[in-house]
Amino acid sequence: SAASDVYKRQELEKADIIVSSLPGSKSTYHLLDEEALAHVKKQPIFVNVGRGSLIDSKVLEKALKENIFSGAYIDVTDPEPLPKKNELWNLNNLIITPHVTGGYHLEETLNRIVQISATNIKNYCEGKGPINRVNLEV
């Protein structure tokens, strides 16, 4: 609706960090499109742990290359799985981790996942690399 579009724009204009855990649906498919990104506050951090279909990989790539997002941390992509030759793998301001569904972990596993994620976000904000890297050449 028009009211929800206005609300979305207003929230995007204020957010220093945009975090999505939205499910995949018709109403969330490519919800963050180029029009929505025209309304984001200057260089927020983007985190997507919901579904990759929230933002098309080409739109995400453009947002990161043009510093619309200062950086991003995702564990979901569009398409999934992300092809090895996709340009997103080469961006220094993007952290991609495996998507691990909730509710199926021992408490200590969940705590470790949160600890690693928090450390990686902190490292990114301080200009450091993640504590664990994916080697695509292996």
Show where each model-derived region lies.
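C-terminal helix-to-coil terminal segments
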Residues: E80-V138
